[in-house]
Amino acid sequence: MAEPDFVITLIGSKLAVPGTEFIYRGPAGECEKCKLKNICLNLDKNKKYRIVGLRNGMELDCLVHDTGVKAVEVVACPIIAVMESRKAFNGSRMTYEAPECDESCLNFALCHPEGIATGEKYTICEVFSEEVGPCKKGLTLKKVELRP
């Protein structure tokens, strides 16, 4: 599958390394008065991203990051999750709905992975053949890779 289009944003200089993955949590209070906030805050809150490139340019001062920020190219990361096996087909589009699960379940983190948003559309890029532990609700689960 082709690499998705990238977005240019600013990130703390210490974190500006290709391959670094992060979840954008939204603006800090200090960002409100910054003249660069439109570039920094152009990502979707609680979505997972990977840095795929660095832009040429200088470090810029930042009230949040002590060593300043750099311009980087980011793409939305694929998400590893589990879903009902009867719905897991390579290439299909789906709208993610978080299942109602017990937090003590062994699969809870895979059923509710970080960086995924309820109501967002994802494409199932791969259905893995490996076994997933038993579901407390009695569902048959498959591990999948989802892309926005």
Swiss-Prot record:
Q: Which residues form a coiled coil?
A: none
Q: Pfam families from the xrefs?
A: UPF0179
Superkingdom of the source species: Archaea
Q: Which family does it belong to?
A: Belongs to the UPF0179 family.
Q: What is this protein called?
A: UPF0179 protein UNCMA_27840
Instruction: Tell me the organism.
Output: Methanocella arvoryzae (strain DSM 22066 / NBRC 105507 / MRE50)
